[in-house]
Every structure is written in C-alpha cells, then in structure tokens.
Amino acid sequence: MGLKLSRGPVKEKSPLEFTRVHILTYFTTNSYLRNLVSKKRRRLIIGGYDLDMSYISDKLLAMSFPAERMRAVYRNPLWQVKSVLDMRHPDHYKVYNLCIEESYDPDNFYGRVERFPFDDNHVPSLKMIQLFCESVHSWLSLDPKNIAVVHCMAGKGRTGLMVSAYLVYGGMSAEEALEMYASRRTTNNNGVSIPSQRRYVKYWSDLLSFSKKGPPEVKLPQEHSRELLRIRLYDTANVDSVFFVVSELQEVPNEMYRPSVELARGCCRQFKKGYCRSSSPRYYISHVNCDSEEDEEVTDGEEPHLVVQMDTESSIIDEKTCLDFYFDKPVRVSGDIRITFYQKMIGSRLFYTCFNTAFITNGLLQFSIGELDKVGGNGRSISGPDFSLELLFGPACSKFGKFLSRDDLSLS
C-alpha cells in the first residue's frame, strides 16, 4: 500500500507581485510604448500583433531586437516575432543578429540564427560584410521560399548597413540600395543616417565585380597601412582644445567580433600666430601607384608616377581658428580606423568618424561636419561655417616617397 502525499497549500502571490505581473502583461500586449520607441520606422500589423519590422524586399525582412522579459515592453516581444514568422514563413526563415550587446537562445528560432556582431552606431570590418552577404546568398539559394530576417537593437543603422550591402551584392548601386532601404524601412526616408555606415556601403560597392551569372567576385583590399602625421580641426569656435582617441578594429582569432583597440590619444590645440614647427613635414613627394606588389616594381627606364601632396597653408587659413596636433612619432594605422573627439578626455563626446585606410587616395582626408558621426549640440557648438576635420598622412609608399621641407618647393 502506497503512501498518499497531500498537496501543500498553494502560495498566493503578494499584492506587489500580482500588480507587477499585470503591469508587465499589459505593456507587452499593448503596443503604445513600442510605437513610441520605434519612432519613424515602419511597423507590420498582422495576426493581432503590431511589430517593428519591415519587408525591404520579398527576401529580406528588417526588424528591431526580438526581446524577452522587461525589454519586451518597448522592443518586439520574441514570442510574437516567432509566431508571425512561423505563420508567414514556416521552416523558411533564418535570423541574422548583428548585436554585440545582446543575444538570445538560437533554439527560439529552431537554431536558424547566425551572429555578425559589431558595435552600435559603428561599422563592421569589410571581411564581416563579405561573410554576411555570402551567408545570406547561400541561405536564399537553398529554397525559393527562404527569407533572411536581419536585426540589430533598433533595427535601423547596423541593419540598414548590412541589408544595403546585400542589395549591392545583388546588383544595385550603393545609392540605390540605401534609398530602397530608407523608403521601405522608415516613413521619413531616413534609413542609414550615420555617415560612416553609408561610407562602408559605398566601400563595399567598390569591391565587387559582376559577371553575367552567379554572385559577384569580391576583391577585399590587401592590408594597406598609412602613417598618420597630423590632425587638424579647421574653423572652430568657442573652444581652445579638443581631445581625441585613435583606435583600430583588430582581429581576434576564432572570433567574428573585432574590438576597437586604442592606438594613440592626444589633444588638438590652437597654436599662437607665428608658431613654426619646422620638424613637421609639410610637403612630400609620393608614388601614388603602389597598392600592390606588381606596382612597386619600377624598371630603370620607367619613371614612377609621382604626385606632390601638400598640407596647404595660406592666408585664408590664418583668418580661421584651427586646432592642431602633430604626432612626434607618426602613428601607423591599417584597415578599419575610428577617431573619436571629446570636449574633455573623460566623457563629453563631440563626434567621431570611421574609415578604411585602403580607400585613402592621397595624403589628406577631409570630413565636413555633415560627414562626421553622431554630431550633437556640443559638436555643432564648436564648429564654424567652414568646419572641417583634416587628417594628414605620410606617403602611400615610402619606397618612392621622401619628405620635403617648405623651402624645397617653389609655390606660386
């Protein structure tokens, strides 16, 4: 004869816990907060759900993060996303997560999840863009019913960069892809708004060559290092010094994510009138066609193609306030570079920019205020009407380049 185990008394929820559960249930089923957070992003209303997701094409779906617990109050609830995808594309969807800051169990989507993580409001490596496009192409080629679901956190910037890159991989121009994403993802045609992210879509476009059939050939640039000599902020206002940090995305073995590693830091200051830094190279001759090993070999009878690169100094510059920093020892940079500017060394970021050294065509990179990233009120307050960030680099190929002093050139 067995023993009967009586059920213990059921523990009632405390009033506080009961209220908490009801509040959470209300907000996760009510889309008011999620509509508020999604701003101008297009939403999909289906099956009683109101979700922050948009079809960019019949094969590409962009959305914000599929969240659980409290985050589901203002992001797409994961269970609702899963329900909609299972209803519309059963067994034919794969999710691409671009977030480095958040993840979830891939089993929520039957294991069909792949991660390509990079920092929010920033850019991935060109290699990551290639791997992403090849993965999406491979998945979509398996079955005509397959679709790719791409998200970051808000489902706008990083998502827009990668979706636009895949549209370029499919044959569009960079501008066409960015415009298509903007019109399909937002109600105000403001899709990929961060200049560096748009810049990388254009970089990607330059690396593709198309044949009549099949995917394009990708020609990733070889490692291309340059020496950063000087940073100048041209036409500044209301400020006498600006701090900066130069960093580089560095590869980690067996990891997809490339962290940003600091290479140098300093402070751009206003030099007094008449200040002369004779040790700083102002002019040099550079061999411009030395991007590959074949170009570096110049025969005795062949004159190398030389170009004079100048850090221009003229009377008009003297009329503007410029903040300068010269590196005593040039900083060698290679690949994907990020330079961030601060009002103070700790906090108070003004703006930043990202670029790849393989796309530096001469010794001077210039960025207007509209070409810099996340420029807020503080950044605009120090910028004059002709503001420009100027980065001066050494010769592309030291084999044929030599520094010249100001007196070595006669200038008209």
Swiss-Prot record:
Expressed exclusively in pollen grains during the late stage of development (at protein level). Belongs to the PTEN phosphatase protein family. InterPro entries: C2_domain_sf, Dual-spec_lipid-protein_phosph, Prot-tyrosine_phosphatase-like, PTP_PTEN, Tensin_C2-dom, Tensin_phosphatase, Tyr_Pase_AS, Tyr_Pase_dom. SMART domains: PTEN_C2. This is Phosphatidylinositol 3,4,5-trisphosphate 3-phosphatase and protein-tyrosine-phosphatase PTEN1. One of its GO terms (molecular function) is phosphatase activity. It comes from the Eukaryota. Residues 239-396 form the C2 tensin-type domain. PROSITE patterns: C2_TENSIN (PS51182), PPASE_TENSIN (PS51181), TYR_PHOSPHATASE_1 (PS00383), TYR_PHOSPHATASE_2 (PS50056). Its EC number is 3.1.3.48, 3.1.3.67. It catalyses: O-phospho-L-tyrosyl-[protein] + H2O = L-tyrosyl-[protein] + phosphate; a 1,2-diacyl-sn-glycero-3-phospho-(1D-myo-inositol-3,4,5-trisphosphate) + H2O = a 1,2-diacyl-sn-glycero-3-phospho-(1D-myo-inositol-4,5-bisphosphate) + phosphate. SUPFAM superfamilies: (Phosphotyrosine protein) phosphatases II, C2 domain (Calcium/lipid-binding domain, CaLB). Disruption phenotype: Pollen cell death after mitosis, during the late stage of development, characterized by collapsed pollen grains, shrunken, with highly deformed exines and reduced size. The keyword Disulfide bond does not apply. It comes from Arabidopsis thaliana. Pfam families: PTEN_C2, Tc-R-P. Inhibited by vanadate. GO terms for biological process: phosphatidylinositol dephosphorylation; pollen development. It is an enzyme of class 3 (hydrolase). The keyword Nucleotide-binding does not apply. The active site is at C152 (phosphocysteine intermediate). Keywords: Hydrolase, Lipid metabolism, Phospholipid metabolism, Protein phosphatase. The lineage of its organism: Eukaryota, Viridiplantae, Streptophyta, Embryophyta, Tracheophyta. Protein tyrosine phosphatase that also exhibits lipid phosphatase activity. Can use phosphatidylinositol substrates such as PtdIns(3,4,5)P(3) as substrate. Pollen-specific phosphatase required for pollen development. Residues 42-211 form the Phosphatase tensin-type domain.
